[in-house]
């Protein structure tokens, strides 16, 4: 906070002479009045003040610049950057206060020039310069989903930073979620570089979501500041949920709460718990018409499979595996993925949205919570505990 204030007062020769006359009231050396009585006091000159003060350093970029006048009205105020470009501002209705309405830049010098007319009818001017804070570093911030995306009902809002955030509470306070339908949700930090917002329950279908991350000017910690504010607006699509109870060898797809499709599948190998398809609620993260799979530990490299929908950063996909057709619908023999017949894999691929939930039950392997997309793998109370507020 800038403590110093600058006050400029007109030093007008005529005004000085008038004040001298008023103080002495005219007359002889004894101070006796002559003529028709005391001389009337001159109208006061305008007094202009500005904040930040002249020569102020490290001014916060979110602090508005204000220019005020007492004993008069402002006739002109200009605030310019080092390139001479004017900064937008607004004059109050009574013409006594000017306030900037444009955000200032980091590590910039600004100059203000103000003119006012006092009650004495005479002009007064004020000129000064100040400089804004210089970040130790600037941080790129990204938002997902992106503008105009249509996503599934389990899709979280994800805010990622290119460096660690220390002042997490300050960041959360600057993040705003607006929805077309009332939705209860919470922010939760998955790491020092990522904070997500997820609803308590799956999003209502067809909800419009607006995210406003007003982060510019907020100290993330250690003098690191975001480069800019970021925003996004996206839509939640139809309600579609994949449910797989691994012992059943079936992948059921529900739409709007009713069974939509049922596909025979082969899940992670039952005989090796490390290859089980892990329990938990995941989301479709990516969709690839053709994907290359490599895992030399388990004896395969450069294997091409079609219609691959990733649902975990642990390495699990829903994809076709025609080579495993003999076991699909009969036995769990995969390396952790959900294997489908090619036609079924294509059919599901075409129906899926990024953000669709995938619910896995019946496995001996518990949820893998090391992923940066693990929002639905913890209870609601555990998720709320990840908030910094």
Please place each PLM-identified region on the residue numbering.
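Extracytoplasmic/secreted envelope proteins and their assembly/folding machinery
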Residues: 66, 111-113, 127, 158, ...
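Conserved beta-strand and immediately adjacent loop positions that scaffold enzyme active sites
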Residues: 76, 113, 174, 250, ...
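Short, glycine/acidic-rich beta->alpha junctions
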Residues: 195, 243-246, 339-344
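Acidic, low-complexity Ser/Thr/Gly/Pro-rich repeat segments typical of extracellular/periplasmic
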Residues: 2-20, 24-238
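Structured segments of extracytoplasmic/periplasmic soluble domains
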Residues: 160, 164, 168, 290, ...
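Gly/Pro-biased beta-strand-loop elements
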Residues: 139, 223-326
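Exported/periplasmic cell-wall-interacting domains
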Residues: 153, 261, 276-279, 295-389
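Short amphipathic beta-strand/extended segments with alternating polar/hydrophobic composition
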Residues: 90, 188, 258-267, 370
């Amino acid at each position: 906070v800038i403590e110093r204030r600058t006050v400029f007062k007109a030093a007008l020769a005529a005004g000085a002479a008038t004040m001298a006359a008023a103080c002495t009231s005219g007359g002889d050396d004894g101070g006796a009045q002559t003529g028709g009585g005391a001389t009337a006091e001159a109208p006061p000159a305008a007094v202009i003040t500005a904040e930040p003060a002249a020569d102020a350093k490290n001014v916060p970029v979110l602090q508005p610049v204000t220019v005020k006048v007492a004993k008069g009205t402002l006739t002109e105020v200009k605030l310019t950057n080092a390139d001479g470009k004017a900064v937008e501002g607004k004059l109050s209705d009574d013409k006594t206060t000017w306030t900037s309405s444009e955000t200032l830049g980091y590590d910039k010098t600004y100059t203000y020039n103000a003119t006012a007319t006092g009650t004495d009818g005479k002009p007064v001017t004020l000129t000064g310069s100040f400089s804004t804070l210089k970040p130790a570093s600037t941080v790129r911030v990204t938002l997902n989903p992106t503008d105009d995306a249509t996503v599934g009902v389990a899709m979280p809002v994800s805010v990622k930073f290119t460096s660690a955030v220390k002042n997490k509470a300050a960041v959360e306070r600057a993040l705003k979620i607006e929805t077309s339908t009332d939705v209860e949700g919470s922010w939760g930090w998955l790491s020092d570089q990522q904070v997500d917002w997820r609803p308590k329950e799956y999003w209502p279908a067809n909800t419009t979501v607006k995210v406003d991350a007003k982060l510019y000017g907020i100290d993330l910690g250690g003098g690191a500041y975001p480069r800019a504010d970021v925003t996004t607006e996206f839509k939640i699509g139809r309600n579609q949920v994949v449910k797989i109870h691994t012992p059943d060898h079936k992948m059921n797809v529900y739409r709007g709460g009713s069974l939509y499709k049922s596909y025979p599948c082969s899940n992670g190998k039952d005989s090796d718990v490390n290859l089980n398809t892990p329990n938990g609620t995941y989301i479709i993260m990516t969709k690839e018409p053709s994907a290359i799979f490599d895992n030399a530990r388990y004896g395969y490299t450069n294997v091409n499979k079609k219609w691959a929908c990733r649902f975990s950063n642990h390495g699990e996909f829903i994809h076709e595996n025609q080579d495993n057709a003999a076991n699909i619908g009969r036995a769990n023999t995969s390396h952790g993925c959900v294997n489908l017949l090619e036609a079924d894999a294509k059919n599901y691929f075409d129906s899926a949205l990024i953000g669709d939930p995938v619910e896995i039950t019946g496995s001996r392997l518990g949820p893998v919570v090391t992923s940066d997309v693990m929002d639905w793998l913890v209870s609601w109370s555990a998720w709320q505990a990840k908030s910094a507020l």
